[in-house]
A protein has these predicted regions:
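Membrane-proximal intracellular helices of multi-pass ion channels
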Residues: 1-248
Length: 248
C-alpha cells in the first residue's frame, strides 16, 4: 500500500511538472509539483501555488484525479481497475482491500467495492448538479467544471478549490459566505464523504435499524453528530456578543 501511494504521488508530481499543467505554460519545480501531488493524494488541501490561477485546466484535472484516487484509496482504485479490465481478483488482493477499508471479513469485498464506486460517483454527481446553477451564473460555461471540481474536492474532504485569481490571495469559498445553497451542499458533501464507506453500507443496508449497525458505524455517527453540533453551538454563543456590539 505504501509503495502504491508513493508511486501515485511520484507519477502525479512528474505530470504536474510539465508546462501543459500550468496556466503560464512553464515548467514547475519538482518540489512544488511533489508537494501538490502529495497534498492531493493525501487529501490535505495544503498548496504552495494557488490551484485556480497557477494550474491550467489540464493541471487541475490531474489534481482532481489525484484527489479522487486519494479519496477512494489506492487499493480501491487498483481493485477497480482490475474489475474494469475483467480480471479475476485474487485472495491476496481481496485481503489488501479488506485492510484498506477496515472491512470485517474478506467475503463480499467485490460487492462492497462496487457499492463504494457507485455511491461515490452518485453523490459527487448530485453535488455537482446542485452547485451548477450558482457557478454557471457566476462563471458561465466554466461553472460546469468548477461545480464538478468542488463537489469531488468536498466529498473527498480534500480542501482544494479553484476559485483563486492571480490578483487575489486564496479566497476559497469566502465569496459565497452568504449563499445558503453553496454552504449547505458543500457541508453535506464533506459530512457524507467523511463518514466513510462502511458506515454508509450499514445505513443503506439496515436503514433505521440502528441495532444492526456495526459498532464502528455507531461510534462514527455518534461522534460526527457531537463533533459538529457542539462546536457549532459554541461558535454561535461566542460570536453572539460580537454581532450585538455596534461598530464605531
Amino acid at each position: 500500500m505504501i509503495l502504491g501511494f508513493a508511486g501515485v504521488i511520484l507519477l502525479g508530481a512528474l505530470v504536474l511538472m510539465l508546462p501543459i499543467a500550468t496556466a503560464s505554460r512553464t515548467w514547475t519545480p519538482f518540489h512544488e509539483a511533489l508537494f501538490t501531488s502529495t497534498s492531493a493524494v493525501c487529501v490535505t488541501g495544503l498548496v504552495v501555488q494557488d490551484t485556480g490561477s497557477y494550474w491550467s485546466g489540464f493541471g487541475q484535472t490531474v489534481i482532481l484525479l489525484l484527489i479522487q484516487i486519494g479519496g477512494l484509496g489506492v487499493i480501491t482504485a487498483a481493485v477497480t481497475f482490475l474489475m474494469l479490465s475483467g480480471k479475476n481478483i485474487s485472495l491476496k488482493e481481496r485481503s489488501a482491500m479488506q485492510d484498506a477499508i477496515s472491512a470485517p471479513v474478506v467475503g463480499g469485498i467485490v460487492r462492497l467495492t462496487r457499492f463504494i464506486l457507485k455511491g461515490t460517483f452518485f453523490v459527487e454527481l448530485v453535488g455537482a448538479l446542485a452547485l451548477l446553477p450558482v457557478f454557471c451564473r457566476d462563471y458561465g460555461l466554466r461553472g460546469v467544471w468548477m461545480a464538478i471540481f468542488h463537489s469531488v474536492s468536498a466529498f473527498c474532504n480534500a480542501g482544494f478549490d479553484i476559485l483563486g485569481r492571480a490578483d487575489t490571495l486564496y479566497p476559497s469559498l469566502t465569496a459565497y459566505i452568504s449563499d445558503p445553497l453553496v454552504n449547505i451542499v458543500i457541508m453535506l458533501l464533506i459530512i457524507v464523504g467523511g463518514i466513510g464507506f462502511l458506515t454508509w453500507d450499514d445505513v443503506c443496508t439496515h436503514r433505521l435499524h440502528l441495532r444492526r449497525y456495526r459498532m464502528q458505524s455507531k461510534v462514527i455517527l455518534s461522534a460526527t453528530a457531537i463533533l459538529i453540533a457542539l462546536p457549532a453551538l459554541s461558535l454561535i454563543h461566542i460570536s453572539e456578543p460580537t454581532r450585538r456590539t455596534p461598530i464605531s
